Amino acid sequence: MPSRLRKTRKLRGHVSHGHGRIGKHRKHPGGRGNAGGLHHHRINFDKYHPGYFGKVGMKHYHLKRNQSFCPTVNLDKLWTLVSEQTRVNAAKNKTGAAPIIDVVRSGYYKVLGKGKLPKQPVIVKAKFFSRRAEEKIKSVGGACVLVG
């Protein structure tokens, strides 16, 4: 049967309030706060706060990250960077005006030579070209333009 009163109400009027006799429920038996993290509270600190103690390495100020960032695209994916309409117009166009594909605008920096190009001239703008890519683009009558 549930009782009507909470435990604290029941203990009123009893000197020790459930904490034993002389000096039992004492002040701070384990030390205050985080005291003893390396000693008597070691297990708690190791389990729930790993890495709390000890030294950490130095901060490298002015570190230049991603200096070698150079996303690449292959020749076989080159025509996917422009719209289908541009591709159709370039195939129909016999006047010799080659379409311009700027791979830097599509998020790539370097053009690699994997795959084949269709036999129509194209102007490719990129920051870097591999030797094979440059040869293949020029073999279909295109041009390689170095940007920035």
Curated annotation (Swiss-Prot):
Basic residues composition bias: residue spans: 1-30
The organism's place on the tree of life at top rank: Eukaryota
GO cellular component: cytosolic large ribosomal subunit
One of the GO BP terms on file: translation
GO terms, molecular function: structural constituent of ribosome
SUPFAM superfamilies xrefs: Ribosomal proteins L15p and L18e
N6-acetyllysine found at: 47, 55, 110
A Pfam family hit: Ribosomal_L27A
Residue ranges, annotated region (Disordered): 1-38
Modified residue annotations for Phosphoserine: 68
Family: Belongs to the universal ribosomal protein uL15 family.
Name of the molecule in the record: Large ribosomal subunit protein uL15
Organism, as annotated: Pan troglodytes (Chimpanzee)
Native organism taxonomy: Eukaryota, Metazoa, Chordata, Craniata, Vertebrata
